[in-house]
């Protein structure tokens, strides 16, 4: 039996996941970060995108986070995010629409503040689409 650690994925609204896992993979500023049982303590920011959780027995579940923090202790990992969703609960059409809207706003460039807001919205929509692609790849579609 593989060694496990406790994983909690929490958004500003609620706890999305809590359970024993074999590994958690998230995207940090310097690339993907895999956390397994006994990992050295760590606190790092994470980028918007997928967080993969490999549960006991090897089953995988994918979540979308809008960015946030990853806290690692040797036997516990916590993902703190402003927004966190199960990838299965995401709407691809809404993510594509948000991406198109942000691209349109970037093209207009009404003001510096609007440009920055549109750039953030575009990055979040792209991260949502990456998460949806990851779950489709996992399902073999």
Swiss-Prot record:
Swiss-Prot/TrEMBL keywords: ATP synthesis, Cell inner membrane, Cell membrane, CF(1), Hydrogen ion transport, Ion transport, Membrane, Transport
Is Transport found in the keyword set? Answer: yes
Gene Ontology molecular function, alphabetical: ATP binding; proton-transporting ATP synthase activity, rotational mechanism
Q: Name one GO cellular component term.
A: plasma membrane
Which cysteine pairs are joined by S-S bonds? none
**Presence of keyword NAD:** no
Signal peptide residue numbers: none
What membrane topology does the annotation report for this chain?
Answer: Peripheral membrane protein
Q: What is the name listed in the Swiss-Prot or TrEMBL entry for this protein?
A: ATP synthase epsilon chain
The opening ranks of the lineage are: Bacteria, Pseudomonadati, Pseudomonadota, Gammaproteobacteria, Cellvibrionales
Q: Which gene encodes it?
A: atpC
């Amino acid at each position: 039996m593989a060694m496990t650690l406790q994983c909690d994925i929490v958004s500003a609204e609620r706890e999305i996941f809590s359970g024993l896992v074999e590994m958690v993979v998230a995207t940090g500023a310097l690339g993907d970060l895999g956390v397994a049982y006994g990992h050295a303590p760590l606190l790092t920011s994470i980028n918007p995108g997928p967080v993969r959780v490999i549960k006991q027995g090897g089953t995988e579940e994918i979540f979308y986070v809008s960015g946030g923090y990853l806290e690692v202790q040797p036997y516990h990992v916590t993902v703190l995010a402003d927004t966190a969703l199960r990838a299965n609960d995401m709407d691809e059409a809404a993510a594509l629409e948000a991406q198109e809207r942000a691209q349109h706003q970037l093209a207009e460039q009404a003001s510096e503040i609007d440009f920055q807001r549109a750039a953030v919205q575009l990055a979040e929509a792209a991260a949502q689409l990456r998460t949806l692609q990851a779950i489709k790849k996992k399902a073999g579609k």
